[in-house]
Structure formats: structure tokens, C-alpha cells
């Protein structure tokens, strides 16, 4: 029976490369022969071959003076980990090891996050995991990832990193531990640290903020002593030791264009200086989440013209994957009814037929993926941005809203985006895990209470706002409101004629009355035995006016887009074509 060496010499005599199978073990062997006799140093490029399994590759000189064996440590021969064992080679001396990146095949620099990779793939994986970036593939999710094409598809590159053993947990665990001073409780995080909540959001422990013990909760003043956050802080539940981590500093926010949240961030970076709000002396509540990351807050760029911002937004919008969900249909695409001109108002149209159709009941929100192991400010900001975009798209899908004209539409959304967003929070209460998000905010205020980084007045104001959100969402959940009812409540809020500066207020008021009549008819048909249901639902709307839009921005968006105001982003959102919305935003039915 021929040995491996004998088989190798047979192939060498033929002066060619060939794949053979050892009869004794059934192992695949690839023999590659160097044809150049004069060259001392040889470079061998291994080609992937079908049907191959982990085995040996013999690299030899034509005269068989030196035999090099390459052992595969990875089952995928397209990106092998190569160990070169040199025999009879005086130049190379003892055995040497040459590693190739398991992801792209470039020269590896060592083991990173559980896999042997190059510096490029190491940095790419680290940025993707730490920023919780979500990528999309424009192909069939099987793009070629090698040294020269690894930057063409970030989605396939990240999937390949994970498939070859790069661990997301390793990225989190390599961060430096937080040093806590002796004067402070060991269970309290500094106000400049990042706070994380457990990944298992359905667990009872998920609703308990990290670093808040029962004794610390008892020491809290004002609203906390009154038991307002009893649903956020379940009694008798103890938290396990949590992991504190710090984000990368001064890393550019070149996020994935496949998420609408990245559009908000990218557009915010191009915002004009006049759109930046003036910060007061108090630190924002998300300061403890942002951990001093200047990539979101420092927007001291050159002043951009409106044309520059519009062109940049158009380019970003074109990069989004078109959605295929019925909720992404163009406004009025499947609507019934007609429009006619109102006497004396040639520029405005009033729509005949129902104000809302069944298509407006659809309100599906998909959370960012992959889900981070620890809830952080970037994930909260991305989730809130998706909800904001989805709410704007819902308004755009109403033909009567479009009939008001662009200026009126923008004015209405600027005036009532906070109310629409809050209704969306209540509607997506479970999908977004709003209770856990609010718990994170409360945790930050606990930290500021310990560190004395915020004035008592400011802290009280923020606590009151969080409580209002909690109370409103809880009351809406208890009412078991269906999709039709949420749609009519949003329409009544959207078509509110009492905002100063609006034109065609009579038409807006007619649309609101129409929404109310249709709402009443729906409840009468659907809940004939619940006489006071309509009244109970309408009485929840005044609570929306108590929500401060500026504080909502600070809680949900400031950690993602810095000082850029939502008002400056809304006109660009409303100018987007519905077909340009990313299908990733729409998926799971509520």
C-alpha cells in the first residue's frame, strides 16, 4: 500500500498539481509542485477545490529536495488556517507557522474574539458589535468575501465573522472595568458610564435597572418614594452582578445605510448650525449612557446649504432597501374614494369616502438586529428612530394628509410628532420593551442622584416626564386598544387645527371631525356593549399634551443624534418616497 510520501513523489514526477486520496485513511491530499527550478523562495497560492476535506497539502520543489506539508486547521479550505512545516530547507530553519484570516484570507495578525483574523476584519467586527450596526445584503446573501472584495458587502462579511467563530461576547468583555471610589456604593455606576440591561427582556429581572438595590431605591426622593415606578422596580427582585462597559471614543459614526436610524444620524451630522439647540448647564439624562462618546454630540461642522442637506438625504434614501410590505405602499395606492376642490380654496382638496382605510391599521415595527446582549443608548436611539420614521410614513399614507399641501403637512408633523411618537410607544409597548427602556432612564437618574451631576429641579422634571410616559402607556395597555382604534386616535391628534400658524384650518378641522365620526362608527359596530369605550379612549388624548417634546428628544434621541432637533429632520423624512423605506423597519405584526 502506497504511503503519503510515495503518492507525493508520484505526483512530483508528473510535474503538476493534483488531488489524490490516501487509500489507508481516505484523506484528501492536494499536491502542488513548483515549476521554477531557479527560484529559491517559492510562493504557493492554494486554489479551493470541490469535495475537499481537511487534510494535507504538499508543496514541493521539482527535484523533491524539500517537502513542505500544509495542515488545515479549518474545515473550510477557502479560508484555511495554514501551518507550514518545512523539511530539508536550510533557509527557513525550524518549523514556522503562517496564519491566514479565516474571514477574508488576508495575512492574520493573531486570534481576535475567538478566531484567527487580520486587523481589518478584527476592526470591522469590533465596530459592528459595539455600535450594534445592522447591515443588509443587496445580493442573495452569499457574496464573495476575500482580501480584495471584503468591503463590498458588510452583511455577508459580518455573517462570515460569526460563522467562523468570532464571538460577540468577547467584544463586550474586553472593555476596561470601571473603577468605583470607596466613598460610593460598589453597586452604583458613575454618571459618565454606560448602563446596560439584560438581554433577556422577557425575564422579570429585565425590568429592574442595573446598579439599583432596594435600599438605594428607598433613599430616592420625590416621585420614587411615592411608588410611581412600582412597575419598573418590582419589589423583592435582586439583580445579579452586571457588566459595565465603555464604548469606543472618537469613532466615526459611519453606520449602516440599511437602517433608518442611520439616516437620522447621518442627516444630523449634516445639519445646519442654526438647527443646533443651545444646551443649558445641566447634564442630559443620557449623559450616563453616552459615556463621553463625542461621535454623537460634537457637531461643529461647516454650515451646509439646504441643497447640500437635501442631496445628502436623497443619496442616503436611495441606499435603503425598498420594502415589500403592504404598509409600504405609496400613499393612496390602494385607497378608495375621490377628491374634489373646495370652493374658494383652489389649492386644497377634500377627499370623499372614508378618511382611513384598512391599510392604515397596519403598523408594524421591527427592532434593530442583532439584539445587543446589553441594552444601550445606541440601541434605544435606533429603536426610537425606527418608530419615528414609521409614524411619519403612516401619516404620509393618508390621502387627506397629502391634500393639505407640503407646508401644512410639515407644520402639522412638527407640532404633533411627539404625540404620534408617544402613541406609537404605547402601541409598540411589548415589541420595543418600553418598560425596560424607561428603567434604563430611571437608572441614569439614580446615578446623577449619587453623583450630584444634575440640579434637583432638572432631575425632578425628567422623572415626572418618565412617569407620565409610564402611566400613559400602562393605561393604554390596560384598555386593550386594537389597531383600528390606534389609527383613529392618531388621526384625531394629527388633524388638530389649534396649532398657531397653520393654513386651511377649516379643512384640517373637517378632517378631524371626519376621523371622530368614523371612530365612533367603528366602536359602535365593534363594541356595541361597551357604551363608554369611546369616551375612555378620547379622555386619554389630553395626557399627550402634557408630554414635553424637548425631554422626549433628550431621552430617546439625544444619545444618537446629539443636539440636532427632530424638527430639522422632519421635513426630510416627509420628502422621502414611501417605497424608499427600508423593509427591515417593517416585519413583525403587533
From Swiss-Prot:
The modification Phosphoserine is found at residues 185, 203, 568. Sumoylation requires both PIAS1 and UBE2I. Sumoylation appears to dissociate NR2C1 from the PML nuclear bodies. Enhances the interaction with NRIP1 but inhibits interaction with KAT2B. In proliferating cells, stimulation by all-trans retinoic acid, activation of MAPK1-mediated phosphorylation and recruitment to PML bodies with subsequent sumoylation, suppresses OCT4 expression. Phosphorylated on several serine and threonine residues. Phosphorylation on Thr-210, stimulated by all-trans retinoic acid (atRA) mediates PML location and sumoylation in proliferating cells which then modulates its association with effector molecules, KAT2B and NRIP1. Phosphorylation on Ser-568 by PKC is important for protein stability and function as activator of RARB. Its main location: nucleus. Residues 98-173 bind DNA. There is a cross-link at residues 238, 575 (Glycyl lysine isopeptide (Lys-Gly) (interchain with G-Cter in SUMO2)). The modification Phosphothreonine is found at residues 208, 210. GO terms for biological process: cell differentiation; negative regulation of DNA-templated transcription; negative regulation of transcription by RNA polymerase II; positive regulation of retinoic acid receptor signaling pathway; regulation of transcription by RNA polymerase II. Keywords: Activator, DNA-binding, Isopeptide bond, Metal-binding, Nucleus, Phosphoprotein, Receptor, Repressor, Transcription, Transcription regulation, Ubl conjugation, Zinc, Zinc-finger. One of its GO terms (molecular function) is RNA polymerase II cis-regulatory region sequence-specific DNA binding. A zinc finger (NR C4-type) spans 101-121, 137-156. Transmembrane segments: none annotated. CDD domains: NR_DBD_TR2_like, NR_LBD_TR2_like. It holds the Pfam family zf-C4. This is Nuclear receptor subfamily 2 group C member 1. It comes from Rattus norvegicus. The gene is Nr2c1.
